A protein has these predicted regions:
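Active-site-proximal glycine-rich helix-loop-beta segment
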Residues: 164-166, 171
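Conserved alpha/beta-domain cores
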Residues: 2-157, 161-163, 175-177
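Active-site loop ensemble at the mouth of alpha/beta enzyme cores that anchors a bound cofactor
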Residues: 180
Length: 180
């Protein structure tokens, strides 16, 4: 999805030209492989899916090459589903510690994708757990950083907001389902 996303940026900027708006902040959402770090570091402002130290280090290197700084969210796998990205909750403190070595990246929060469910309430335990993880890490850090919680999508964003989401992902609700 990296190239697809990057190709849409000029079109969106063209549509926004002439409007008195703050410039958009581009978020990259989706599993990211290290070999795609260069274009992501060059075009996006926030990467929501950093789930391993090696990926963060590569993004950091590529951001430095591009003369940019990026914000990142650390993705946590709370569903236990191997096909979903994210660090295991037990390994999250180590990933946060590794993030301190990144000079061009700043970890500003956490992100999760809960297990798919037809009832939005089924996502509540995962959202509450992510908030609890964030709060525990913030307490351990003396209240520093980790201000964002990206959780909730088109089907369950109301529950996510009730549980403290600061970023929701509602592309399907806004734009419809992706083409196959």
């Amino acid at each position: 999805y990296v190239q697809e996303s990057i190709s849409k940026i000029p079109k969106i900027l063209e549509e926004l030209a002439g409007l008195e708006l703050e410039p958009p902040r581009w978020h990259f959402i989706g599993q990211l492989q290290r070999n795609k770090a260069k274009p992501v570091a060059a075009h996006f402002d926030l990467v929501e899916t950093v789930d391993r130290a090696a990926l963060g280090a590569e993004l950091d290197r590529r951001a430095a090459e591009a003369g940019r700084s990026l914000e990142v969210l650390l993705q946590v796998n709370l569903s236990g589903e191997p096909q979903k990205g994210g660090v295991d909750p037990e390994a999250l403190p180590a990933l946060l510690a590794a993030s301190r070595a990144w000079s061009q990246l700043r970890a500003i929060g956490l992100m999760t994708v809960p297990a798919a469910a037809s009832d939005p309430e089924a996502s509540r335990p995962a959202f509450a757990r992510l908030r609890a993880l964030r709060d525990a890490l913030r307490d351990a850090e003396g209240g520093q950083a980790l201000r964002e919680l990206s959780m909730g999508m088109s089907a369950d964003f109301e529950v996510a907001i009730e549980e403290g989401a600061t970023i929701i992902r509602v592309g399907t609700a806004l734009f419809g389902a992706r083409a196959p």
